[in-house]
Amino acid sequence: MMRVPHSIARVLLVIGISVLTLSACVSDERRSRYSQPIPHYDVPAQVIYRIDDHRYVSFENYSDCFHGDAFYIDTRLGIRTDLGREGVENFQGKLINADPSGRNLVFPMAAPPHTACSDRSCSTPLIYSTDSGRTFHGMVYMKTFNPFNRSKDYTMAVNGDRLYVAEKIQDDAYVIEYPLVQGIDLTKPYPPGVRGSSFTASWRPTYLSGLRTPSGQERFTCDASIRPKNNAAELSQ
């Protein structure tokens, strides 16, 4: 089950979205299994998303490419921030972090393949930072019964003080433009003078023109050949 960091979970609970709905309503048997302590998997950390030479997402303690812990790392600023478990590594869409100041970041989440949602769907969050990744806030960007596959239809991009969330719809895309100012909570009314917008990509076809992550990476990647060496007995201890 997706684990959302406590600081982000508190924000989502305030707006009336329980942490359980971020992943799925599961059977009692599976809920019992997920309530057990997470084993320590004998695997090396992987960089699954790199912004530049000192900023990246580290994937750790994973059983496979869809179930692990993610951390945002900035070696220059000495930042290591928990991004949760079974979340960002499952996002299948396009991601561009291109704020030249380095202050504003976004990392969308999804759920592992074949996640069973409740009859009201899965509410799926993104997390964003306005302080260079020291802290993150959360908001829901998608409600769906198939978060893993549906995330393929999304493009997320940060450019300076703007966050773009674009959902592909047939031959076009619907784009919501969010303002990113220091400490903003995008789940609440914006401060005076701060505005966002929405539009179709066909109306503003150049809105992402020239935007790129400094490393050039636009998707999460994971080496599926790396698997735990622990045997079942070791994992159960």
Go through each PLM region and give its residues.
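Short aromatic loop motif centered on NTY/YTY
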Residues: 140-187
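Bacterial signal peptide processing site
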Residues: 26-29
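Beta-strand-rich domains and repeat architectures in extracellular enzymes and scaffolds
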Residues: 36-71
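Short beta-strand elements that form the blades of beta-propeller/WD-repeat-like
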Residues: 49-63, 101-120, 153-170
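Repeated scaffold domains used in trafficking and secretory/extracellular systems
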Residues: 42-46, 88-100, 143-156
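Bacterial N-terminal signal peptides that target proteins for export
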Residues: 2-12
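Conserved Ser/Thr-centered positions that define the repeating blades of beta-propeller domains
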Residues: 73, 127-135, 179
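C-terminal motif of bacterial Sec signal peptides marking the signal peptidase cleavage site
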Residues: 21-24
